Amino acid sequence: AASDVYKRQVFEDVYSIIADRKIHPKEGSYTNYLFDKGIDKILKKVGEEATEIVIAAKNPEPEEIIYEISDFLYHAMVLMVEKGVTWEDVTQELAQR
């Protein structure tokens, strides 16, 4: 359905904004803060967010899981941009599985 395509486009749109922030830094941007701090900070945040998903999954409210997965995906996209990995790379890998 058209709405499904739009929903998937959100991933590309957020990724594009993150990639643009790397090329055109914006003062006060959390994304730029992560890029400025470097790979260790980015990896730390990815790990923290993954752990928060696990903790949220133990609770009965799905909203908490949704929130934490969204945080994780954002930080994973920062990592993807930092390492030059695209959604095309990821979707091709998933399609092969």
Q: Could you say what each language-model-derived stretch is?
A:
Residues 1-6:
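Short, small-residue-biased leader/transition segments that mark boundaries at the very start
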Residues 8-13, 17, 24-29:
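Phosphate/pyrophosphate- and phosphate-bearing ligand-binding catalytic cores of soluble enzymes
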Residues 17-20, 25, 34, 74:
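A charge-rich, low-complexity, intrinsically flexible signal that marks solvent-exposed coils, linkers
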Residues 85-97:
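C-terminal end-helix/capping segment
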Residues 46-54, 62-83:
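An amphipathic alpha-helical micro-motif enriched in hydrophobic residues
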